Amino acid sequence: ERAAAGNPWIWRPAFFGAFASVDEALLKRGFHVVYYDLTHLYGSPRARKSGTDFYWNMVQMYGLSPRVTLEGFSRGGLFAYNWAADHPDKVACIYVDAPVCDVFSWPGRSSGNAGLWKGMLDEWGLTEARMNTFPGNPIDRLKPLADARIPVICVCGDSDRVVPFSENSAVVRQRYTAMGAPFELILKPGVDHHPHSLENPTPVVDFIVRHQAGYEAGQCYTLRGNYQNSYRKFEKERVGTVAFLGGSITEMKGWRDMICEDLKQRFPYTKFTFVAAGI
């Protein structure tokens, strides 16, 4: 209905309209939702060149923000990460959802996806013999993103049998955070490759909105501090105690339970103690 200041946009290179809760919520917040189908190009140089031409068309012809939010679902993660590694100065943040980060995991040489594996080789102009030096795995192209401190939010199921978390996003998370770069993870317990996204997209939407240019200047209040100490404790020490103060938040169902579940999803390796300290 009305574009937000700065004309922010989110760009999907694959699977437009699938599990679109984040896109729909951002549309209501004044974002442009943009699709350019590069699904079957596996983040190849050809895909990235086409994507760059498309990017300039969006910026110059339609006046969209010079910093785009990239959205990569499944194999769309190959394009999102690779294009961002080529152009970190053009990226506001990245939202990936069960993304492919290692082609040896998916489509994989021996995973039953022979047709997709061959299609990927053909697209990249590679042979089996040359795949040991494959240059397009996101797990190996993180340094340009980390140097630019591009914020990444990742949503995954911990029981994904198609694009296993342990072989893909877990590796990215470990390497990216080791470089000191910002990476938020929402890990869905017991969830396979589908369904993507979240029933309540608010955590992802809020992440994307607050990483747009000019966001802080547009706030009508000033925070007296932040949660960096808690974040470091949850991430590094992997223990945390959270106390809920007040009768309603302690006794009633609702916000307390939602916050507990949200923290456990965002910090799946952290052991939490929750205290209901009603006064």
Where are these regions (language model features)?
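C-terminal catalytic histidine-bearing segment of alpha/beta-hydrolase fold enzymes
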Residues: 162, 166-216
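Alpha/beta-hydrolase fold nucleophile elbow
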Residues: 62-74
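Alpha/beta-hydrolase active-site loop
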Residues: 42-63, 82
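N-terminal secretory targeting modules
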Residues: 214-245, 249-272
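Short amphipathic alpha-helix adjacent to the substrate-entry channel of hydrolases
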Residues: 18-34
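The feature captures the conserved acid-bearing segment of alpha/beta-hydrolase catalytic domains
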Residues: 113-170, 174-177
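Glycine-rich nucleophile elbow surrounding the catalytic serine of serine-hydrolase chemistry
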Residues: 72-82
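Hydrolase active-site cap/lid region
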Residues: 82-130
